[in-house]
Amino acid sequence: METTKPSFQDVLEFVRLFRRKNKLQREIQDVEKKIRDNQKRVLLLDNLSDYIKPGMSVEAIQGIIASMKGDYEDRVDDYIIKNAELSKERRDISKKLKAMGEMKNGEAK
């Protein structure tokens, strides 16, 4: 079988399609994040309405809100710590892969 060399226009089309695919992937992830965020807001309001009962004082409602806020702030802190740990592991793996690649290149020479 004979392979034909792609023309310049074919290469441009490939690059254009690849960029479009990546842009669509980023947009899909962005929309999915917005969906998750709004679903969380709906759940938060549902939870809040479960706690608030008729005849409660403003102070009691504010106490519930403050408690929920504290819980969410703690979760954010936990996620920040987890993200830092994952990033450190990713960097360590990248260093190992780079070292392995350099060892392989050294053997090939």
From Swiss-Prot:
Changing residue 15 to L: Fails to form clusters and presents a diffused pattern throughout the cytoplasm. GO terms for biological process: regulation of protein localization to cell tip. Residues 14-41 form a coiled coil. One of its GO terms (cellular component) is cytosol. The modification Phosphotyrosine is found at residues 72, 79. Disruption phenotype: Cells lacking this gene are hyperactive for PTS sugar consumption. In the absence of TmaR, PtsI is diffuse, released from the poles, and, therefore, more active in sugar uptake. The absence of the gene also leads to detrimental effects on the ability of cells to survive in mild acidic conditions, probably due to PtsI hyperactivity. Absence of the gene severely impairs the capacity of E.coli to produce flagella. The mutant shows a reduced swimming ability, is completely impaired in swarming on semi-solid agar and has a dramatically reduced ability to form biofilms. Keywords: Coiled coil, Cytoplasm, Phosphoprotein, Stress response. Phosphorylated on Tyr-72. Phosphorylation on Tyr-72 is important for activity and polar localization of PtsI. Phosphorylation on Tyr-79 might be required for polar localization of Hfq. Changing residue 51 to F: Localizes to the cell pole. Regulated via phosphorylation. Phosphorylation of TmaR on Tyr-72 is required for the release of PtsI from the poles and for its activity. Only phosphorylated TmaR can release PtsI from the poles, since the diffuse non-phosphorylated TmaR binds to PtsI quite irreversibly. Changing residue 79 to F: Localizes to the cell pole. Has no effect on survival in acidic conditions. Abolishes Hfq polar accumulation. The keyword Cytoplasm applies. Changing residue 72 to D/E: Does not localize to the cell poles. Its main location: cytoplasm. The two helices, which seemingly fold into a coiled-coil, and the C-terminal region are probably all necessary for TmaR condensation. Pole-localizer protein involved in the regulation of several cellular processes. Regulated processes include sugar metabolism, cell motility and small RNA-mediated regulation. TmaR controls the subcellular localization and the activity of PtsI, the general PTS system enzyme I (EI), by polar sequestration and release of PtsI. Polar sequestration of PtsI restricts its activity, thus regulating sugar metabolism and enabling cell survival in mild acidic conditions. TmaR does not affect localization of the phosphocarrier protein HPr. It also plays a central role in cell motility. Overexpression of TmaR leads to the formation of chained cells, suggesting that the cells cannot complete division. Overexpressed TmaR forms filaments. Interacts directly with the PTS EI component PtsI. Binding is reversible as long as TmaR can get phosphorylated. Belongs to the pole-localizer TmaR family. NCBIfam families: PRK05423.1 (NF003844), PTS_reg_TmaR (NF040881). This is Pole-localizer protein TmaR. It comes from Escherichia coli (strain K12).
